């Protein structure tokens, strides 16, 4: 059984914990409380399998605190990560400015592929859902960008996240197959 480690990173108050709870079907937190360090959620998704035989997959979703005071812990969090989801509040201009820093630290420095990264522009309830006006500069404009609004269309983000998990598992399976073939030859 494959086990994938996915990091949820991004600025403070971007909605990482709310999204993580929703996507892993964990309990809801109604009152805001900043994540201290990291919170690890383990889950399985019946829609994601590692091969045609339907072998299940396990996931660890690491909900990482967005405060800069945890920056010294980031290298340890990144160890053995298979994917990174950068969550930001699309309604806060400073979050957009921080995106390149999160991308550099969590995707470029550990040499992950862009396909292993997904951006989520999270819209908090009542904030409106302006999907059209978000333009990102290179290299962020090459990444998969998904808008989430858990109030208006919660299933859209769930389906996009399942697609993302499938791509991570496919990449892991291909890598494992290549490794097995190199051992046999």
From Swiss-Prot:
PANTHER family: DRAB5-RELATED. Component of the IFT complex B, at least composed of IFT20, IFT22, IFT25, IFT27, IFT46, IFT52, TRAF3IP1/IFT54, IFT57, IFT74, IFT80, IFT81, and IFT88. Interacts with IFT88. Interacts with CFAP61. The lineage of its organism: Eukaryota, Metazoa, Chordata, Craniata, Vertebrata. It comes from Homo sapiens (Human). The keyword Nucleotide-binding applies. This is Intraflagellar transport protein 22 homolog. Gene3D superfamilies: P-loop containing nucleotide triphosphate hydrolases (3.40.50.300). Small GTPase-like component of the intraflagellar transport (IFT) complex B. One of its GO terms (biological process) is cilium assembly. It is found in: Cell projection, Cilium. Keywords: Cell projection, Cilium, GTP-binding, Nucleotide-binding, Phosphoprotein.
